[in-house]
Amino acid sequence: MSRVRIVKGKIYEAVEGNLSYYSETDIIENASIIYSENSDTEILYGGNPEKPPMAEINIAADAIVHFRPMRNWKGKEYGFDWMRIKDTGLFGDDLYSDLTGTYDKYPSADPAARFTTSPTLFTDLKREYSNPVYSIPWLLKDRKPTSYYPSWICVEKNKKIKLSLKVHIKDKEKLPTELVIAYDKTLCEITTSLGQGVENEKSDPTKNTHYAKIVIKKNESYKLEDEIELKVIKDITTPEILKVLCDGNEAGYLKLYNNKVKRLNVVCVRVKANIGNGENKGSIKGKTELENYLKQSLIKTNIVEEDLNILRNIDSTPNTDLSLPSISNGSGINVGGNIRGKSLYDYLDEKLKAMFPNFGTDGKADGTGKYDKFLRLYFFSETAYLVHNGATIGVGGIGTPIGAGRGTMFSGITDADVAHEAMHAIALGHSFGTQESISAITPYLFKYKKTENVMDYAHLDSKDKYSTWKWQWDKLRNFNLLTE
């Protein structure tokens, strides 16, 4: 949101305390004659500006409605993200205030790593769901009002999907008269168990807003599973908001994410190689999981398959590059090693480009490759490892560096972990780490193996991982190989 203030004369501001200005983008000040600043002591300029404090608004309604995903949702139908407050019973739905934080050591490499919650990280995370934060004065926890956070959904235009609701009633002996979802009829269509949303000329004389009724029960808290059928019928480029009204007061929100579909070309490459233990060719897996994970942020994939035979050199002599001690121990590939100073990933890209070149008008290879603008996933049948602090650690796959557009998969990797490594190659870091892991790529960190997010390691505890967060959608949709 922007604000422009135009005056013909002078502007005077006088305050007894501090005066602060905050902006999410730029602050520009112009003067036609003189712009002056005076201070009794000094005027300071510096980087690393503070983030604006979060505003808080009390919800006046006598009911609260949370939007939640459909029953048995596993991320296949749409992307959905909400501030977890432990109200669904799903794995990963623990209080994010208890799960956001950092480790003193990298937890996947050191079981003795200790976790510390971070109120600062949690405060920053709140902004992804809502700013301002809404407060429910009558719903208390530890004698304090609880907070309300809108949920996010990313769903394709004209696709019908189902959503669930979680409802809290202030006083079950004094029930609300009406609980409805109010929405722009040109934005979406909504049907609940009480019927399709309709206009209400008294509430909206222009008849642009429709209202879908929600069941009111004589319970303090209840769940309405698969209560809503939603179809977005409009192109969304900036977030839209659906509001729940309780007797005219706002009682809940659902934010609709950008629904413009983006596309990603992917090439899955079976590598035929010999690292000194015989000729082997990799097998492709994980395509369905990758498609499902990316669909949550409305990225659709076009996946092709190729074979890359690097058994022999151009002169037909045996290619022994991958048996060099700098890249292999004879039974597995060292993902941190090199081939005459070249990383494994650069080496594979070079071989792929040589096998599938683009040609200029003169019929000669022009130096570019057919798959340069594809996400490139290489599959080996060999095992792999890395050396960390003198210890050899087995590796199923790796997508590095983050956002580089290529990943390498090895023997033993699961379908879900192929997609996990591909997400590294596109834009995402792990969901856990140390203080040093926090960056523009990974602004938030969580407790290890405690979320269902695809960038966690919950599978090591036999838990499903299948979801992505709204802030991850932002990262994924900015990948430089995407097309529209």
Predicted features, each with a name:
Residues 58-371, 381-387, 392, 477:
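Propeptide-to-catalytic entry region of secreted or membrane-anchored zinc metalloproteases
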Residues 26, 263, 374-376, 451-454:
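A residue-level signal for beta-strand positions that form part of recognition/binding surfaces
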Residues 242, 405-484:
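The catalytic-center signature of Zn2+-dependent metalloproteases
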Residues 362-373, 394-403, 446-449:
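Extracellular/periplasmic catalytic domains that process cell-envelope and extracellular macromolecules
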